[in-house]
C-alpha cells in the first residue's frame, strides 16, 4: 500500500514539474513534438541522476567502507587482485569497499569505467577461497570494463521515455473522447482528473511490462560478465565461484542494488522479471562456452 501511495504522489509531482517546465519553455505538451521532448527529458533524467550518484547511493545502501590502506592480509590481497585485473582490462583501478553482510556477494557501480567502485561483502571474504573470490572480482571488473552501468542507464532511459510517451499519448486520446461525450460544466477540470488517473494507471502497467526488457538485458549482462571472468582467470575458477554462491544466504542487499550484484535474486515469481539467471543456467553456459 505504501508503495502505491508513493507512486501516486511521485506521479503527481512529476506531472506538476512537467507542466512547469513546459510552461516556462513554451513547449505544448498536447503536441507529439512537445510530448516526445517531455518524455525524453524525464525518461532519462532519473536514470542519469541515479548513475551519477550511484557510488554514493551504493555505499549508503550497504553501509560500505572504502578501503584506502589495507588493515590485514585479506584486504591487501583484495587490493592487489583488483589492481592487477584493472591493469589487465586497461581501466583505472576502481575504489574498493567492504560491507558487512552474511551473504556472499559483490557489486560494481559508477558513472564511468575509469571512476568506478567495487564492493564486496564480508560474507564473501570469509567464505570464498582466493581462487573463487578472484573470479568474482574479475566478474565485477568485466562489468566496469564493458561499460554495463552506462549501457543499463541508456536502456532504462529509452524504456522510461517510451513508457511516459505512450501512456500520456493514450491518456490524452481517452480523456478527449470522454470529454467530447459530455456536456457539463467544469469539463476541463474533470478532463484533467481523468487524464491523471488514466496516465497513472497506464504508466504502472507499461512500467511493469517494460521491466521485462530491462531485466532481460540485466540477465544477459551476467552471462557476458561470467564469460569475461572465465577468460581472465579461468573457467574452472568462475564455475567454482558460482557453485559457492549456491551455499550463500539469501542476498540482503536492497532491491535497488541487487541488479548490480553477482549473487542476485533469480528465484523471481516470474523468470521474466528476474535480474539474474539461475546459477545453474550460468554454470551451464560456462560449460558450453556460451557468450565467450
UniProtKB/Swiss-Prot annotation:
Keyword Hydrolase found: yes
Active-site residues from the entry: 140
EC number: 3.4.24.-
Biological processes annotated in GO: proteolysis
InterPro entries: HtpX_protease (IPR050083), Pept_M48_protease_HtpX (IPR022919), Peptidase_M48 (IPR001915)
Transmembrane segments: 4-24, 32-52, 147-167, 193-213
Co-factor binding comment: Binds 1 zinc ion per subunit.
GO molecular function, one term: metalloendopeptidase activity
Gene3D superfamilies reported in the protein's UniProt record: Metalloproteases ('zincins'), catalytic domain
Keywords recorded for this protein, A-Z: Cell membrane, Hydrolase, Membrane, Metal-binding, Metalloprotease, Protease, Stress response, Transmembrane, Transmembrane helix, Zinc
Cofactors required: Zn(2+)
GO CC terms: plasma membrane
Origin: domain of life: Bacteria
Cell compartment(s), UniProt: Cell membrane
Pfam family, one: Peptidase_M48
Major location (coarse): membrane
Keyword Metal-binding set for record: yes
UniProt topology in membrane: Multi-pass membrane protein
Residues at which Zn(2+) binds: 139, 143, 222
Recorded family membership: Belongs to the peptidase M48B family.
The name this protein goes by in its record: Protease HtpX
Organism: Buchnera aphidicola subsp. Acyrthosiphon pisum (strain Tuc7)
Gene that produces this protein: htpX
